[in-house]
Amino acid sequence: MVRNQSRCFLGIIITISFFFFLLSLPNTFASPTRSLCRSDQRDALLELKKEFPIHSNGSHHVTTLSWNKTVDCCSWEGVTCDATLGEVISLNLVSYIANTSLKSSSSLFKLRHLRHLELSHCNLQGEIPSSIGNLSHLTYLDLSFNQLVGEFPVSIGNLNQLEYIDLWVNALGGNIPTSFANLTKLSELHLRQNQFTGGDIVLSNLTSLSIVDLSSNYFNSTISADLSQLHNLERFWVSENSFFGPFPSFLLMIPSLVDICLSENQFEGPINFGNTTSSSKLTELDVSYNNLDGLIPKSISTLVSLEHLELSHNNFRGQVPSSISKLVNLDGLYLSHNNFGGQVPSSIFKLVNLEHLDLSHNDFGGRVPSSISKLVNLSSLDLSYNKFEGHVPQCIWRSSKLDSVDLSYNSFNSFGRILELGDESLERDWDLSSNSLQGPIPQWICNFRFFSFLDFSNNHLNGSIPQCLKNSTDFYMLNLRNNSLSGFMPDFCMDGSMLGSLDVSLNNLVGKLPESFINCEWMEYLNVRGNKIKDTFPVWLGSLQYLTVLVLRSNTFYGPVYKASAYLGFPSMRIMDISNNNFVGSLPQDYFANWTEMSSVWQRPMLTLDYKRNIAIPGSNYMGDDNHQDSIDLVYKGVDTDFEQIFGGFKVIDFSGNRFSGHIPRSIGLLSELLHLNLSGNAFTGNIPPSLASITKLETLDLSRNNLSGEIPRGLGKLSFLSNINFSHNHLEGLVPQSTQFGSQNCSSFMGNPRLYGLDQICGETHVPIPTSLHPEEPLLEPEETVLNWIAAAIAFGPGVFCGLVIGHIFTSYKHKWLMAKFCRNKRKTTIGTS
């Protein structure tokens, strides 16, 4: 019995032991436990946290907020450790705004086992310290988008394990050190947008290189033929430098190369493709903006893999070789700004994969071959600034993919016979300006419902503007300037309209300005100059918060420009030209108080809206966008000037040639950023407001042909940018400000103000007015007045002498009796009065 119990107990013990044995198996055969972060690594990171304090506007994506002693540093955000040794091997602080410099003593360089270091977008300043050479295990280094300066430290050569360097967008300069030759494992080198200079770049030893990007620096040497030894090179980008010499054809011998960008340098001479074989992998070749010349060699056909060929902005001449038809993979061909001539070769139209074709700014002529219709994949076509003639190519109307067309500055004279229209829903961007197009705008144009941009300006079009265009709600820019269009203006701005720019200037339009424009909430530019529009001032346009340019010049607008119940000001206005109309009335003193854009310092916008793709893109210095910029005609400095681009900071007011009266509003002085002010040819009265002296950037001021009086404010003489002044034909008086700006004006700028003086140096003897304000009790006399006064004195002299003799005789003969009688009578009166 006892033996059985013992056996039972022993069995239980064995069973339990076996159970625990099974539980221990996973740990027994598992890999060793991951080591915790080493204390020296943790302490170095905590010191680094103190060196890189958290900035108030720093990114919350990666921060050091999680870095504290209570947590294993290998689990900290941005930190990666070696699982076995507990050493920090990767540090990623992208967009951690440090606003500090890297010092040689930084605890960062105590992390000697780092393999991956990423400190981009950290606002790091100062130089790269030589201590960077201590991180000899680094394979990946990214310090891009900071504010680093100075030269590469020579110690960079110690990082012989480096495979990737990215220093994009800093201010590093000087030569690349020769120690760079030690980086034999380097695969990618990104130095774009710095200030590196110098001659030969020692890269030939770096045979592992696959990507070299030296763009946007100041390198000024030839491209060394030793680079042909880089047999793994795939992308070579050196645009925007000062590299010179012949085209480096040896690059084409590198069999692995797929992308070459040499644009915006100083390469010169003919281009040749050496002994390039048909096995070339090159897909992109960009040599634009250089000084290359001569003919394009037939051997270009050997680059059979080419997809993008950019030869624009050089001096190539002759005809495009027919062998180009062998480049069947081309989707982009850019030959603009050269001297190519003759007819467009039909070989181009065999490139059926072409999506982008740019032949602009050449000497191509004749009719565009109908075979262009074979380019069924074409989405953008630019034939502008050539000598093409005849009718517009039919493929433009028929294509279902062609959304961007520029045929401007040619001699096309007809829209052609339209047999078929393409996809009506495709958003289009057409520029047919500056041709010889005749007749009315065809009604079928309205079948294309989506136009982002349509430019028919500077042609010979007549008839009325198709009313159906008002249904094209996706219009952003419409330019019909300088034609012979007549009739009424359509209601372009129906509900939901995207119209942002409308130019119908220099036509024969009549009627009123459509009040539907109030629905154009995106309107920025409106130009109706030089028509026959008869209407009152559109005060209601003040509700358009983006309206920047308003030109009503040379129409028959009439009446006041101010209504107390409706006036809102023009807060976004930069250019207003309402000259040569029939506007009347006075302006209230606070008229310009709400023109806030005129008093704001203009800054180039970081981003702007791409209306076609509905995305944000880098801002432009000019009104409009990068593809289509607004233009304008203005009387500037007394000369009718055509501005093909409108600088964003260009701010102008022209109210000239009307019948405004009353005082010039004092609030004009609030427009501190105004550059050009023209109030001439009106009936303004009163003094010139001294507040004008507050417009410190004013360049031109024309107040001529008014009824202004008083003195010219002395403060105007301190406006250092004022270069063109006209105060002529007013009633001004007093001393003209004695300043360089006033002294450099023509005498005619002050004529018609006879009481102005201080013009001796300007006008010489032709106009020296009376300085009335110096000695008003003793006015200076003109020579003719002096002669007349002497004649008057001579005439009065004879009678004066006769009267004097008679009075003298009476006085001497009867003086005793007369004096006694007079004196005694007065004395008696005094005595009686005091008694």
From Swiss-Prot:
LRR repeats lie at residues 111-135, 137-159, 160-182, 183-208, 210-230, 231-254, 255-278, 279-302, 303-327, 328-351, 353-375, 376-399, 401-423, 425-448, 449-472, 474-496, 497-520, 522-546, 547-568, 570-594, 647-671, 672-695, 696-719, 721-744. Residues 1-30 form the signal peptide. Pfam families: LRR_1, LRR_14, LRR_8, LRRNT_2. Keywords: Cell membrane, Glycoprotein, Leucine-rich repeat, Membrane, Receptor, Repeat, Signal, Transmembrane, Transmembrane helix. SUPFAM superfamilies: L domain-like, RNI-like. Glycans are attached at residues 57, 68, 99, 134, 182, 205, 220, 275, 377, 462, 471, 482, 594, 678, 707, 726, 746. Belongs to the RLP family. It is a single-pass type I membrane protein. This is Receptor-like protein 37. The gene is RLP37. The lineage of its organism: Eukaryota, Viridiplantae, Streptophyta, Embryophyta, Tracheophyta. The keyword Glycoprotein applies. InterPro entries: Leu-rich_rpt (IPR001611), Leu-rich_rpt_typical-subtyp (IPR003591), LRR_dom_sf (IPR032675), LRR_N_plant-typ (IPR013210), LRR_R13L4/SHOC2-like (IPR055414). Residues 812-835 are cytoplasmic. Residues 31-790 are extracellular. PROSITE patterns: LRR.
